[in-house]
Amino acid sequence: MRQKELEKWLKIVIIAVALCGLVVCAVAIPWIGHVLIAPDPQISDMYIPWLVLFIISAIPCYVILYLGWRVAVNIGKDRSFSLENVRHIKLASKIILFDALYFFVVNVCMWRIYVNHPGVILALVFIVFACVVVSVVAAVLSHLVVKAADLQEQSDLTI
């Protein structure tokens, strides 16, 4: 696959993920919240804190999509193994980890003030674990891109 074609497909995927995230945050989460509180008005106090939690947690996801867009642009310019991409991927790794920890800490705090269910905390452990795995994979990828950039630089100097 050529660089420009790869850039195009990456951008299409990033746009699709951004639109799906927008639908989830603007439509699905509020709708699910209303469905859950309809049978039990006692839990209606939990709706707004949960909605705010999800919206705040979505912001870092869009920052990561922006960083992915920047990486795609660099790939299109045939700068796949550049230090700029390393910085973007490393920053994305840190943001993923921060978002997972934020989500976990806020959920535990909400559980402590009785705005959350212990079962949600249990399910959240798996979500946080998946985020940590993705963060580690991104960190490893940034390390490999550094090595590839060094090799490419050495190759360019020897020719």
Which residue ranges define each predicted feature?
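Alpha-helical transmembrane segments of multi-pass membrane proteins
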Residues: 19-33, 135
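Membrane-helix interface/capping segments
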Residues: 62-83
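Alpha-helical transmembrane segments and their membrane-interface junctions
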Residues: 99-119
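Non-cytosolic membrane-interface motifs at loop->transmembrane helix junctions
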Residues: 40-43, 118-126
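Membrane-helix boundary elements
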Residues: 38-64
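Alpha-helical transmembrane segments and their immediate juxtamembrane interface regions
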Residues: 122-153
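Alpha-helical transmembrane segments and their helix-start/interface "positive-inside/aromatic belt" motifs
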Residues: 1-18
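Select subsegments of transmembrane alpha-helices in polytopic membrane proteins
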Residues: 14-18, 90-100
